[in-house]
Each structure stands twice: as structure tokens, then as C-alpha cells.
Amino acid sequence: MGVPFDYAPERPEHIDAILNGLDRYNPETTNIFQEYVTLQCEEKTYDCYANLALLKLYQFNPHLTKDETITNILVKSLTVFPSPDFSLALHLLPPHILTPISSSSALPAAGDAPLSEAVQKLAVLNTLLSSANYSQFWSTLDSDDLYADLIADVSGFEELIRIRIASTISQSVREIPSSELENWLGMNGEAFEKFIKEVCGWTIENGSVIVPLNKENEAKGTVVRENVKMEQFSRVIRRAYEQPA
């Protein structure tokens, strides 16, 4: 059985009580959820269910919305790709925020333009990660100071992204050139070797990174066998000779 969608091992008891009661719809809990988002950013924890509950409160109470909290939730959701969390959060935001300013038929409300730009830039990062365009992800992240501002509150953002990239890679390859993996992880030299050996537990041999065998990257043929009873087969043949009504 898989892990439930609403499960978060580090979730405090008072947050769990709110999420499982009617108070999750109480606007007075907004500050509590916002503080919890800040805690997640500081302690490298993550609680998608609680974050989505906060965005839902913002939908019903727009006057309580905090732009910084929204962007922090989106940035945190990037650190758990390839899960759909970023898209789930994105679809709880007002439609005008998701529309490119240049193509919007109406001017954004006061204060919306900066948030709209930030959300759209984060959406670009999500697209690059989802499409496994990791080298372009790192170059895009370094291309604009706004990205640095957006990820500043999320402790260990780059390390968390690298761990997710490495996890995804380990599911599909057994060996990869070091130079290519350096581009995918956005690091090189001693830092790269340390990450590969100490964090990933992989080895480097003759200019290539060796990924240990696991159930995902093991090439194994699959034989599927189905048993069809004679009565089922005869029923198919009989229907072929039946006259249409």
C-alpha cells in the first residue's frame, strides 16, 4: 500500500488537529498555516496537504493572502518533483495570476504583477524539471536575480533539487559520463565528487558514474501469462456467428 496523500511524518499535532477538523476552513487558522510554511522552509520538511489547505483559505479569503507565502509553497513543491504538487498548488491560485501579463486582457490588480511574474518564472522551472531538462534548469535558475530572491527562504533548495534529480536518474541508468551528470546536477569538481559518493552512495570509475543496481534500473524481461478457459473462448466464437438483431 502506498503512502497516503495527506501523510506528513513531521507534521505537528496542532496542525494535524486543524486539518482533520472544521477549523481547516476557519480564516483564523491562516496565520498558523503561514507560520507552518515558514517552519517547513527552515527545517527542510514538507507538508503538501497543509500547504494546499492554506491556499484554499486564500481562495475564500483573498484579503488574507501573502505573496511570499504563496511563492514559498510553490518553491517547496519544486523540491519534491516529479510529484504533481506544483500543479496542484498552481490550480488553487487566481486565474489572472497565471495569465502572462503581456497577453492579459486587463491590467492586474494592485500588487498582483510581482506575484504573477514570480509564479510564471517558477512555472518555467517546474516545466524544465518535469521534462528532465536539468542542465537548462540550472542555467535558468542562475539567469535572473529574481530566482535567487524566490528560493532564498527555502533552506537547502539546491541540495534538495539535486537529490531529486539523482533519485530520478537512478531509476533509469546504470552508468553515466561524469561530465554529463555534472551538467545535470549543476556542480563540478570536489563538490560533485563529494555529492556522488557521500549523498548518493555511487562510485566514479574511468570518467563515469556507476549507479548501483536497483529494481528500477535493472533490465529484466517480463513474461505475462493469461489463462483463458475453453468456455470463454467458445463464447467468443459463438458470438461471431450470431446474426445481428
Curated annotation (Swiss-Prot):
Q: Which Pfam families match?
A: CSN8_PSD8_EIF3K
Q: Which PROSITE patterns match?
A: PCI
Indicate where this protein is primarily found: cytoplasm
Q: What are the GO MF terms of this UniProt record?
A: ribosome binding; RNA binding; translation initiation factor activity
What's a GO cellular component annotated to this UniProt protein?
Answer: eukaryotic 48S preinitiation complex
The record's subcellular location field reads: Cytoplasm
Q: Which UniProt keywords apply?
A: Cytoplasm, Initiation factor, Protein biosynthesis
Keyword Endoplasmic reticulum: yes or no?
A: no
Instruction: Name which cysteines form disulfide bonds.
Output: none
InterPro entries associated with the record: ARM-type_fold, CSN8_PSD8_EIF3K, eIF3k, PCI_dom, Transl_init_fac_sub12_N_euk, WH-like_DNA-bd_sf, WH_DNA-bd_sf
Example GO BP: regulation of translational initiation
Provide the PCI domain boundaries. 46-227
The similarity comment for this entry is: Belongs to the eIF-3 subunit K family.
Q: What does this protein do?
A: Component of the eukaryotic translation initiation factor 3 (eIF-3) complex, which is involved in protein synthesis of a specialized repertoire of mRNAs and, together with other initiation factors, stimulates binding of mRNA and methionyl-tRNAi to the 40S ribosome. The eIF-3 complex specifically targets and initiates translation of a subset of mRNAs involved in cell proliferation.
Assembly and binders: Component of the eukaryotic translation initiation factor 3 (eIF-3) complex.
Question: What protein does this entry describe?
Answer: Eukaryotic translation initiation factor 3 subunit K
